Structure formats: structure tokens, C-alpha cells
Amino acid sequence: MTQISERLLVQAHLDAKQPKPLTAEEEAYYRSAIAAELKAQDAVLVAHFYCDPIIQALAEETGGCVSDSLEMARFGNAHPAKTVVVAGVKFMGETAKILNPEKRVLMPTLEATCSLDLGCPVDEFSAFCDQHPERTVVVYANTSAAVKARADWVVTSSCALEIVESLKDNGETIIWGPDKHLGTYIQRQTGADMLLWDGACIVHEEFKSKQLEDMKALYPDAAILVHPESPTSVIELADAVGSTSQLIAAAQSLPNKTLIVATDRGIFYKMQQLCPDKVFIEAPTAGNGAACRSCAHCPWMAMNTLERTLKCLKEGSNEIFVDPALIPQAIRPLKRMLDFTQAARMKLAGNA
């Protein structure tokens, strides 16, 4: 299976570095200019929870969306804007284009990728699937359009458990890709028969149970929130496990005033916004400074800046294109996910 080279990771950090922080005047200029361009071009900005707070705030201010990847896909699909600007990583832009082939999809940069996407080349993954033709292929949203086209289902961390549980109840066996930690978590929770691809998120894989136990000893009254892309030993220490949106909901509902959070620190913007009376602490990674690869923030998410956002709008640059031959195959598993989650929402509303 493909391994992500340290060179790629180091380069991502270098690319993500900001030349210098913006002054208050510069920030105000970019925010105003971007808002004007969005309005003039009938465009909407959607941003992931892991983007820098300034990008998330701008999406909210301009009538866009800040959410997890499932809601980003749903919002972009339902919004009437002719142009969707996706602040996130490349697979999110591709997903928006697959679901809305008639729309123009722009990104602040096309260099913002994902270690899960990079670690699951379509030729290798397809060969793996071909060895087990009897199995249903379920892939995480953090994959290329080509890998999605090879799948039967696409899932996000907010709906993966329910979808796999449903497939298991139907007697289906599963190939899962690419995140091995999320796959292991789902396998343990559902008891499903799953073959796992060997991929990992560079942010979540760095959280370590020993350091987390030490931190819990320092904050004994704190609750621990963990994203399921983390290693099993970290998940086992959690008071709540879930997707970004589920962790935000847990932060609101748990009585604890201090929360240790094992996911990308970009999520703190929304948590602090919704829970201003609570204290949020980053879970420790394997190292600090130069010793850690991600240091609890995705280097590719950090590439989404105000400067790049304005530039892509003014120039029409960094447009996402997906091979038209792939779209019919890739949209099928995505629509299955959206239909499944919509049906689950309606059922929940009916039971309320």
C-alpha cells in the first residue's frame, strides 16, 4: 500500500506558512473585497470546520456555510448560486463538482490535498477491490473522484456507522477505504465483516494515548472529545467520539466546563462560538514544534487564506474539473449517501 513520504508532508507545511499575519486594515480589505466579489458573481463560500477561523467567519458573514464534509456537500447541492467557492481540501471541491456539474466550482488553491486521498491511488485501490468482487465497496469522502467512481457507497464520519450498520443488516460484507483507524472503529462498533485499506490522517494519527492520559490527570474534570480517525487507544479514552459536527454537539451537551479535543484545532472556532463559557484544550500530539508533522492542524487546510480566496474569485482561477466520464459513476455512491442521510433525518423528525 502507498505510504505518504515525509518530503510531501514537509513541503505541505512550507506551502502553508503565511508570509506574515495580516494587519487589521488588510483583513478588513480582503473580507470586504471577497464579499463584494461573491455577490457580483452569484457565488457562495462553503468552508470546512478545519479551515482557519477567519475563513469560517467570512463564510458565515456572506451567507455561506461552515460545516463538516457531509453538510458542505448537501449545502452546495441545494444552494442556487452559480459558483461555489470551496475552502477546504481538493476532494471537497471535487465532490461539489460531481454533485453540481453545471456549476462553476473554485478553490483558493488546488494544492490543498489530503493524506487519505494521497494514500489511496485509484489503480492500487481498484486492484484491491477486484480481488474481492463479492464485497460492497465503501469509501470515505476523503478520496479522489476516481476512487469514488469505483465505490458502491461514499460515507462521511457523521454517517458511516449508520450506513455500515445498514449494510451489515442486509448481509453484505465490506471493503473499506482509506482510513484504517476510522474503519477499525466502525468495525468494532458494528461487528461488520470489513477488509480495511491501510490509510491514515496525518493530523489524527499523531494523537497518542499516553500523553492524553497525562493531560487528563492534569484536568481530571475535563471531558475528552475524539474524532474516530484517531488511533483506537485514543478513542478508548474518549467521553464522546464523533465527526466534527457531532463533537461540536457534544461540546454543547456535556456538562463539563473543560474539554480536551482530539481533532484539528480549526474546530475550536465553532466550539468557542457556541460554548463561550467553556474551556477547550488541544489534545497532545506525538511531539511539538518541529517534532510533530501536523501539530493538530492540517497543513493543507491552512492553505486556504483570504488572499488566495480573493485571487481565485477575481481571476476565476483554481477551477475544479472532473472527468465527465467519471461523474455518472461517482455521483451514484454520493447520492446514495445523501438519500440515506435525508431519509434518516426525516425518520428522526417523525419520531420527535
From Swiss-Prot:
Major localisation: cytoplasm
Pathway listed: Cofactor biosynthesis; NAD(+) biosynthesis; quinolinate from iminoaspartate: step 1/1
Residues binding [4Fe-4S] cluster, per UniProt: C114, C201, C298
Residues binding iminosuccinate, per UniProt: H48, S69, Y140, A141, N142, S157, H227, P228, E229, T244
Catalytic activity line of the entry: iminosuccinate + dihydroxyacetone phosphate = quinolinate + phosphate + 2 H2O + H(+)
Pfam families with a match to the protein in the record: NadA
Gene Ontology CC annotation, any one: cytosol
Molecular-function GO terms, alphabetical: 4 iron, 4 sulfur cluster binding; metal ion binding; quinolinate synthetase A activity
Family matches, as InterPro entries: NadA, NadA_sf, Quinolinate_synth_A_type1
Name by which UniProt lists this protein: Quinolinate synthase
The UniProt record lists the keyword Iron-sulfur: yes
Compartments it resides in: Cytoplasm
Organism: Pseudomonas fluorescens (strain Pf0-1)
SUPFAM superfamilies: NadA-like
Family indicated by similarity: Belongs to the quinolinate synthase family. Type 1 subfamily.
Alphabetical keyword list: 4Fe-4S, Cytoplasm, Iron, Iron-sulfur, Metal-binding, Pyridine nucleotide biosynthesis, Transferase
Top EC group: transferase
One Gene Ontology term from the biological process aspect of the record: 'de novo' NAD biosynthetic process from L-aspartate
EC annotation from Swiss-Prot or TrEMBL: 2.5.1.72
Organism taxonomic ancestry: Bacteria, Pseudomonadati, Pseudomonadota, Gammaproteobacteria, Pseudomonadales
HAMAP family in alphabetical order: NadA_type1 (MF_00567)
Role: Catalyzes the condensation of iminoaspartate with dihydroxyacetone phosphate to form quinolinate.
Cofactor: [4Fe-4S] cluster
Free-text comment on the cofactor: Binds 1 [4Fe-4S] cluster per subunit.
